[in-house]
From Swiss-Prot:
InterPro entries the record matches: CC_SR_Kinase, Kinase-like_dom_sf, Prot_kinase_dom, Protein_kinase_ATP_BS, Ser/Thr_kinase_AS
Protein known as: Membrane-associated tyrosine- and threonine-specific cdc2-inhibitory kinase wee-1.3
Membrane topology: Peripheral membrane protein
Alphabetic keyword roster: ATP-binding, Cell cycle, Cytoplasm, Developmental protein, Differentiation, Golgi apparatus, Kinase, Magnesium, Membrane, Metal-binding, Nucleotide-binding, Oogenesis, Serine/threonine-protein kinase, Spermatogenesis, Transferase
Domain Protein kinase, residue spans: 108-355
Species assigned in the record: Caenorhabditis elegans
Impact when changing G558R: In eb95; induces defects in spermatogenesis
Gene: wee-1.3
Annotated SMART domains: S_TKc (SM00220)
Effect of F103I: In eb94; viable but induces male sterility due to abnormal sperm
Amino acid sequence: MDDTEGNSSMDSIRNGQSSPLPQVTPRLPQIPMMMRETPLSTKRERQAITPRFRRPAPKMIKTMPPTRSIWSVRKESVPLLVTPQGPKPLESPKYDHTNAQSFFEQVFQIDEIIGRGSFGEVFAARCREDSQLYAVKVSLAPIRQHSISKYREAESHMIIPPHKNLVKFYRAWEETGRLYIQTELCDQSLLKYCTEKHALPEDEIWNIFVDLLQAVHHLHSNDMIHDDIKPENIFLTKDMICKLGDFGLVINLKNPNDVKSAEEGDSKYLAPEVLNGRPTKSSDIFSLGMTILEATTDLDVPSNGDSWHQIRNGQIPDRFFAGISTDLRSLIALMLDSDPRIRPTSRDLLDHPVIKKKLMKRGTYVKCISILNGFFYAFSAVLVWVMAFFSVLFHPIVRFHAAIKDRQSEICAQFVNNQQHTPIQTPETSKVYLESLTGVAVRQASQIVSPFDFSDDENPPNAQRRLFTGAVPCRLNFDNDQDDDEEQATCSSSNSSAIEPQLDEPESPPRMNDVIDKLGKRGTPRSARRNLTFNRHRQVAASVAPKSSLNHYNHHTGSGDGFSNNSLIPISDQERTEKYLRMRLTEQQLDWADQNNVIDEAPPPMSCPPRIRRSIRDLPRMPVLNFNVLDEPSNKPTVDHHTILEQSESPRRRLNRGAKPVPRNRMMSFGSSGDEV
């Protein structure tokens, strides 16, 4: 291979290829010159150079999977409260021993999972006892009954005195072989906060440094070692107050068992002397320095390798400290010293002049926040108490007022029910309609009716108007009391009626015998007989009067309630039945004729089209009103509107009008009205 080929291959390795070959691991893009000096990099730079591919999934191994959720295994046990004196039965007004659910499920309302690790899961849950949000940590692995560190974390929380920069502990209990720890709920972790912002302002770094230093000093003053200080175990409240939590690896120097069973924390923040020995207070200072270094420089802290030793040897490039003050950089260098004897203690750091100044400023801020929070909580408690007091005070008055309103509604309903009047456009599903005479007659009489109504009413698009039989047959007599012009009263769900002409005889109209046979099996509707025999006391007086006077009375008197004028004449049951049958037959013939003239298009909304009215109904057009005629002289020749209407009629209408006119009765019933022509 010649030199040109060798140089091209070396350049491709140094600069990287723009498009990697298939089936080949993609190479990293070109690394900046500042990063060639050291393998250390920031988190943002690491995200930019990380290859965007995933390794293949490992092969499936048919073994028993580990328990990864608290819901997978459940044992029947009684919840035990963990106390310094030993476990005790746990009681709560929200807990029912007979319920199959656990104490955690009954007393808490689980909102979400906010953390998950090798030890367990952390839930954000609202307690039903006080309606406050808490963080509940649940162990995944069942607790070993004879283990020395069975309640180690819970006991550490109870031994350590409360501090403003430590996560507040409430209680811990054991149930179904698992440990539950209830603590206060913070807004977010420091790891999440730094990952979102990458580079934090120096003022925020000083505040975090001062808060954590006070928490570590509080632990060291009580002979406790945290042994797991890292951004993941540091939490921020909504007021940006930093708190140290997760006491799972806390070592009590007063307890020999804790010293013997001490475990190593996260290797990223581990002091070098812990690899060959045990954790000490100086190792906590080193972990605190690594946490402040990561928050200040956004450094991607390595967990092993040469970079891990490079940081512990103090070989950190200056480019990571760009824009950082000398005081903060010198303090970080002191805490990261490889010799634990040279590292300052928490007391030495608090006595530093710069930290003293920052501590005084931070203390003022924390006191103001605590005062405001206390005032807010007190005001909330008073407000809740006042609301509860007024609720109890005015509750009887509100109930009394509601009872009065209900009684008023009942009285109004009784007054309306006493009125024997069915309103216009009453739906058939109405209780008032079903109990009325019309509703009873409609349910009892199964008469074939026309499915269409071509009245000038508001109709929904593509909807059919259903007609139903009226309760009482009525008629308008225009001759010498003949029965040929009798017609059964029908009504529709509209507020207008129309006089329809009787069309020619249909091709196959219903026969009288069929109607008689149909009615003979069922009989005359009881409501019709009751309506036709209305006002018996007046019928007795009418039977004595001469027939001519009755006819005269019928011709010139009309009742607006839908009753027949001739109903006052006493007739026998047989005559009444025959008249009723003739009326039904006449209406069926008319409906049959209407069905033969159905037009296959639905009337538009709001009104019936004029062309449908002109082609179906034999009604004269509405004349155009000209009000100027009233102002003109009266000697003008009068216009015969009937002649104009006859001339403008279509040939089909003239043909229909040439037939023998058959008088039609009005279509009327209770609650409806018609326009006379």
